[in-house]
Design a protein with these regions (language model features):
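Two-component/phosphorelay signaling modules centered on CheY-like receiver
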Residues: 14-32
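Short hydrophobic/Thr-rich beta-strand motif most characteristic of the beta2 strand and flanking loop
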Residues: 28-35, 40-43
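Acidic catalytic/metal-coordinating carboxylates
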Residues: 35-36, 62-65
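Active-site beta3 strand of CheY-like receiver
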Residues: 47-53
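Active-site residues of response regulator receiver
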Residues: 55, 83
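Receiver (REC) domain active-site loop signature in two-component systems and cognate sites
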Residues: 58
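C-terminal output helix
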Residues: 87-89, 103, 107-117
Length: 140
C-alpha cells in the first residue's frame, strides 16, 4: 500500500464498529466510524473513503438507502453491506443496489478484513482502467 486506505464503518452497534476498527487498523487502514447512514450521507459530499462497510438495518436511513445515495454520488465506490438478517431477500437487495459484497453477521473478523482488502483492490483496478483525457491512448 502506498498510502493508508480509508474505510468508513457504518453501524448503529458500537461493538461491531469497535471490532472492525481494531481489525482494520491492525492492517494499516485508517477507519472512520458512523452510527447512522444519515451522518455518512452528509459527509459524502465533502469526502470519499476507499471502501464503505455498512449495516443494512439502522435507525433512520437504512444501509440500502445509503447504498442508493453512494451509487448516485460515487458509482465506483465499493460498498460492503452487512446484516444480522442473513436472509436471501437482503442479499438480493444488496446486490441489486450495487453492493460490492454482502457480509452476514456474525462474521469472521479475518474474513471481513479480507473482504475490505478485495474491495479496495477492485476499486484500484477499476481506476487503473480509466485514463485521464490528457493521457488517452492514440493509435500508432
Amino acid at each position: 500500500m502506498s498510502r493508508s486506505e480509508t474505510v468508513w464503518i457504518v453501524d448503529d452497534d458500537r461493538s461491531i464498529r469497535w471490532v472492525l476498527e481494531k481489525a482494520l487498523q491492525q492492517e494499516g487502514m485508517t477507519t472512520v466510524s458512523f452510527d447512522s447512514a444519515d451522518s455518512v450521507i452528509g459527509r459524502l459530499g465533502r469526502q470519499q473513503p476507499d471502501v464503505i462497510i455498512s449495516d443494512i438495518r439502522m435507525p433512520g436511513a437504512s444501509g440500502l438507502d445509503l447504498l442508493a445515495q453512494i451509487r448516485e454520488l460515487h458509482p465506483r465506490l465499493p460498498v460492503i453491506i452487512m446484516t444480522a438478517h442473513s436472509d436471501l431477500d437482503s442479499a438480493v437487495a444488496s446486490y441489486q443496489g450495487g453492493a460490492f459484497e454482502y457480509l452476514p453477521k456474525p462474521f469472521d473478523v479475518d474474513e471481513a478484513v479480507s473482504l475490505v482488502k478485495r474491495a479496495n483492490q477492485h476499486a484500484q483496478e477499476q481506476q487503473g482502467l480509466e485514463l485521464p483525457a490528457n493521457q488517452a491512448r492514440t493509435p500508432e
